[in-house]
Amino acid sequence: MGKRILVVDDEDVIRKFLRIHLAKLGYEVREAADGEQAMEQLRKDDFDLLICDIMMPKKNGWEVIKEVKSNPKTKEMPVIVLTAKNEDSDMFKGYDLGVNFYMNKPFTKTQLLYGLKLMFDDTPEEVRA
């Protein structure tokens, strides 16, 4: 079974794009439309990577990341931020919270593949190329 990735974004089109492309690469993808759904899934299941938007209803991405990084069960899980917040201060805040890779919207498939390459040593051949 491939690595398990939780994609958290309130935009359906973003989640669908990620689900399709990540599944083609052999990853198992779960989705959440907001931070509360994300935390519920993280309590129930184990994931190898979190891809998280910042600006979401109910619980924003910063709150999700703080909880993930403060929980002994999930603190080592890598996090990719995917957001329209493209100020340097936002990026620095993410890295201060323990984010591993920061992608601005709109993003490209190449940027996504590069982020996966950084997160996993055993990436699919398409990602390593």
PLM features: what roles do these ranges have?
Residues 56:
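Receiver (REC) domain active-site loop signature in two-component systems and cognate sites
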Residues 6, 31-49:
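Acidic, metal-coordinating helix/loop segments flanking the phosphotransfer/catalytic sites
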Residues 16-24:
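Charged docking surfaces used in two-component/phosphorelay signaling
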Residues 117-129:
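The C-terminal output helix
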Residues 107-117:
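C-terminal output helix
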